[in-house]
Amino acid sequence: MFSLKLFVVFLAVCICVSQAVSYTDCTESGQNYCLCVGSNVCGEGKNCQLSSSGNQCVHGEGTPKPKSQTEGDFEEIPDEDILN
């Protein structure tokens, strides 16, 4: 019984590890994809450039990260407009 539990735990760990996404170091030519939103993994003074084909590491400014939403970003809608 203990061996079965151990096997199930081992199997679950293997599945989780195999599904993990790994990002490689970005190269000088910027052809490797890189994580941009949330954290910057480009390194070596490079920044992420967002594009529809994927995120690439580039020298320079890159694409600014989206600012987080705050309460002041939205206009309040009066209750009577919602109910009508």
Curated annotation (Swiss-Prot):
GO molecular function terms listed in the Swiss-Prot or TrEMBL record: serine-type endopeptidase inhibitor activity
SS bond list: C26-C34, C36-C48, C42-C57
Keyword Flavoprotein attributed: no
Localization per Swiss-Prot or TrEMBL: Secreted
Pfam families in the cross-refs: Hirudin
The protein's name: Hirudin-HM2
Signal peptide: 1-20
Sequence segments annotated as region (Interaction with thrombin active site): 21-23
Glycosylation sites: T63
Keyword annotations: Disulfide bond, Glycoprotein, Protease inhibitor, Secreted, Serine protease inhibitor, Signal
Key word Secreted present: yes
Main location: secreted
